[in-house]
Amino acid sequence: MVHNAYDSFQLLKDCPARIDAVESYGSKLFAGCYDGSLRIYSPPESSASDPSELHQETYVLEKTVAGFSKKPIVAMEVLASRELLLSLSESIAFHGLPNLETVAVITKAKGANAYSWDDRRGFLCFSRQKRVCVFKHDGGGGFVEVRDYGVPDTVKSISWCGENICLGIKKEYVILNTANGTLSEVFPSGRVAPPLVISLPSGELILGKENIGVFVDQNGKLLQTERICWSEAPTSIVIQNPYAIALLPRRVEVRLLRSPYPLIQTIVLQNIRRLVKSNNAVIVGLDNSVYVLFPVSIGAQIVQLTASGNFEEALALCKVLPPDESSLRAAKESSIHTRFAHYLFENGSYEEAMEHFLASQVDITHVLSMYPSIILPKTTIIPQPDKMVDISGDEASLSRGSSGISDDMESSSPRYFLESEDNADLESKKMSHNTLMALIKYLLKRRPAVIEKATSEGTEEVISDAVGKTYGANDSSKSKKSSKGRGMIPLNSGAREMAAILDTALLQALLHTGQSGAAIELLKGVNYSDVKICEEILMKSKNYSALLELFKSNSMHHEALKLLNQLADESKTNQSQTDVTQIFSPELIIEYLKPLCRTDPMLVLEYSMLVLESCPTQTIDLFLSGNISADLVNSYLKQHAPNMQGRYLELMMAMNDTAVSGNLQNEMVQIYLSEVLDLYAAKSAQQKWDEKDHPPERKKLLSALESISGYSPQPLLKRLPRDALYEERAVILGKMNQHELALSIYVHKLHAPDLALAYCDRIYESVTYLPSGKPSSNIYLTVLQIYLNPKKSAKDFAKRIVALGSFESSDTTKMMDSVLSSKAKGGRSKKIVAIEGAEDMRVGLSSSTDSGRSDVDTEEPLEEGDSTVMISEVLDLLSQRWERINGAQALKLLPRETKLHNLLPFLAPLLRNSSEAHRNFSVIKSLRQSENLQVKEELYKHRKGVAQVTSESMCSLCNKKIGTSVFAVYPNGKTLVHFVCFRDSQGMKAVSKTTHGRRR
C-alpha cells in the first residue's frame, strides 16, 4: 500500500543560525532565524530552471537581512496575490516583495501567538492573550481594524471558515461569529495534544483531537463518520491534494485524503520545526537545514500503485490528473479497472470484479471470454485473456466446441463423474453459479445503453431505406442473417451485433442459473438474441415456454405454432412429462393467435383449424373478437371446416346481427335449410316424415327465417320440396310480402287458424307492412276472404305459386286438388268442392308482392253454392280482432245467410267503441267551440282598451317624448314606448337568448 508520493531533497544545510520559520517566494527560499535575521537562499546562477518554483538542487545563500526582526521570527507567509510577506514575531509586520521593505506593522498584534489570513477577502485575524482581532487590508499599504472579540481562554490555533473564525482554545473548539461575536461550541479538544485547526481547500475544516482528525463544515457540524487517524498527534498539517501531510514528533506522514485515509508514505527526519506548503512542494524546516518534499508525478504514482496491486489508490489518483489530460486519465482508469477486475475475479470477488469491468467500459466480449461455457454467435471474435477461469460446472452443459460431442464422450468425461471428487464438483457448481450471477448483473447494467444504440441504429437504417439514400433495393453488399424479426442483424451492424452477443450470453446465463422466468421476460421485450444458438439451447433443456417467446419475439410464428401443436398433441397422448401436460393445451394456440388477427389473418385461419374441433367455442370467439373479415372466415370455414360454418355464423349473429352482411345471412339460412332437407330426405326414405313434427333443426330454420331479414327468399323457395315444409314456405312467402299465399298455406295446408291469426297479428304490428294508400287492417280482411271463399283462394294460390317459380305449371293441378281435398281442423272440416277448370289456369301476375287486396277492394261477388264457407273460423276471427278490422268492409264480405246473433261478439264491442268515439268527438268539438268564443271575447276586451297620449308622455325605454311617433302599449295599459324602441328591444332580447343558447 505504501509508495513514494514525495521525493525528499535537502535544499540547504549547515545554516549558522537556528531556523525558526521558512517560506518560499518563487524559486527563492526565506529562512527566518532565531537571531531575528532573514536569510534568502536561491538556486545556483547556472540553473536555468523555472524561476517560479523551488528547484531540486542545493541552494546557496543569496542575501542576509540582519535585524529583520528584533525577536525570533515565529512564522512567515508569502501573500502572492498582494506581493506581501507576512511575518509574526513580536508583532505582525508586512513587507513588500521582492525588496522586503516594511509596508505595515500592526502594533495591536504585539504578543500575538497565532494568526490566519483570508486571501480572498484580504482579512487578517490573530489572537493575543484572550482577545481575537480582525483587520482588513485597504488595498494599498495599510490595514484597518474591523473588530475586537473576547474569548474564554488563550487561543492555541486559529483559522478562517467562511466569514466566521474557528478557534482552538485550551479545552475545546469554538466557532466565532464575526457578525455578532457569539461563540458556538463544537466539541472538546484533546487532553494531551494542543488544539489544531486546519482549513481545507473546499472550505471545510480538520480539527485535531489527539491523533485523530475530525471533519466539520464551516458551522462546526460533523460531516462524516470517518476519521483520519495519524500514528501520533500531529503538530502541523499541510494539505496538498490529494494528500494530507502531517508533522509528527519524529517523522512526516503522508496520507491519502480519501476514506479510509490510508498511509501512503513516511519520511523520517530529526528535529523538524516547521512544515510549510509551497506552490509546488512541501518545505520541511529543521534546526539548521531545510528539506523539500517534491511530489512524484501522478502518472508515476499510478504506475507504482498498479504494479504493486494497490488498484483502489491508483484509481483515486486518476481523479486528480489535470483536466487537460482527460484522455490519458480515461485510458489509465480503464486499464486499472480492467486489471483490478481480473485480480478480483481470480480471487473469487466476482460481483466486485464485474463492477470494475463495467467501469472500465471494456468490450463485452472481453468479459465473456472468461466464460467458455457461454456460446456466442460465430461472427464474434473472442479475445484470449491472459488467464481464464473455467466456470462451466455441471449447469454449463454447452460450450463453444461441445455442439458436436456425443453423449458417450460426455459420459466418459472424468471431470463430472468421478466419485472421489464429489466435494470438488460441489465447489465447482457453487463457483459456477456465483460467477454466472455476477455476469448476469454485469450484462443487465450494460444492456440498456447497448440496446438503445442498436435500436437507434435500426431506426436510422429504416429511415435511410425509406428515402433511398443508404440501402438500395438491389444492394448486393448488404448481407444479412437468414433469420426473422429482431434476430435479423446485418453483419456490418456493430451496435446490433454487440446487442446480439449480450442478449445471447445473458439468456444462457439466466438459464444456467435456473432463472427461466427471467429468461422469458427477457425474450418478451426488445431483444437481439441469436435465434439459432438460443433455439438449440432451449430445445436441449426442454424450456418450451422460453422457446415460444424466442420464436414470438423474432416473428417466427409458424415455428411457434407448430411447436405448440406438437406439445398439445403430446399432452393428449401423455407422451411428455407431467409439467408439460399441465402447461401446454390447445387453448395456448388460441392465445398465441389473438395478437396476430390484425397483422396476419391467413396465418390465424390456417392454424386455428388445428384446434377448431377441440375448442370450437374459443376458436370462433377468436374469429369474432379478432376483427377478421367475416367473409374471409366464412369462406375459409366453408372450404376447410364446413361443419363449423353454421356455428360461426350463429355466434356472429348473436353478437351483433346488424353487422352481419346479407351474404352471410343467406349463407346461414342456406346451411339451416340444408340440414332440414337432409333430415327430410332421411325420414322420407323411412316414411317417418311428419309435417307437424318440429325437430331442433327445423325449429332453428323457422326461427332464422322469421328473425333474419337480410337473406334472399327466392332461392330458398326454389329449394323447398313440393309436398313438405309448408310452414317454412309460408314464412318465406311472408318475407316476399306474398301474405295471401302465406295465409292460404296456414289455412288450407296446415289447417292452423291459430298460426294464421298469429301471422296476421305479426304483420299488423310490424311497421314494414304499410301498403301505399291502404290500411294495415287489410291483412285480416285477406284471411277473411280465404275463410269465406276457399275455392277462389285455392285458385289464386295455385296461379301465384306458379308465377313465383316455386313449382312447374304441370304440378298445379295436383296441388289444387291437394288444397281442396284437405280437411279442416277440430271437427269443422267440410268437403270443399273440387276446383273445375284448373287446366285453364293462366300464369301471370303483374306484381311479385301481395298488396293485401280483398274482394271488397275489387267489388267481386262471392262465389256461392260450390264451396263451403269456414264460418266458424270467420266468427272467431271477428270476435277476437274486432278492434283491428274495418267493420263495414267485413260485413260486406259475410254471406247473406249469416245469423245476426252469431255476430254479436263482433258487433257489440264494435258499436260500443264507435258510439264512445262519436261522443268523445262531440265533446271535443264543443270544447273547441267554447275555447274559440273565449279567445274572441278576450280579443274584444283588449281592443276596447284606451291609451292616453299627451304632450308630456315619455317613452319608457329611451325616456324621450312620444309626440306624434308611432307608439306601442304594454299589456298593463300604462307603459308607453316608441314602436321603434320596442322593436329594437325585442331584437336585442332575441340576440341575447341565441348567444346564451350557443354558450350553453
Curated annotation (Swiss-Prot):
Keywords: Autophagy, Cytoplasm, Membrane, Protein transport, Transport, Vacuole
Domain of life: Eukaryota
GO cellular component, one term: plant-type vacuole membrane
Topology in the lipid bilayer: Peripheral membrane protein
SUPFAM superfamilies: WD40 repeat-like (SSF50978)
An annotated GO BP: vacuole organization
Keyword Lipid metabolism (UniProt): no
Localization, UniProt: Cytoplasm; Vacuole membrane
Residues covered by region (Disordered): 394-413, 844-864
Subunit-level organization: Homooligomer. Component of the homotypic fusion and vacuole protein sorting (HOPS) complex composed of the class C Vps core proteins VPS11, VCL1, VPS18 and VPS33, which in HOPS further associates with VPS39 and VPS41. Interacts directly with VPS11. Binds to RABG3B.
Similarity field: Belongs to the VAM6/VPS39 family.
Function of the protein: Essential protein required during embryogenesis. Believed to act in part as a component of the putative HOPS endosomal tethering complex. HOPS is required for the central vacuole formation. May play a role in clustering and fusion of late endosomes and lysosomes. Plays a role in vesicle-mediated protein trafficking to lysosomal compartments including the endocytic membrane transport and autophagic pathways. Required for fusion of endosomes and autophagosomes with lysosomes.
Protein name: Vacuolar sorting protein 39
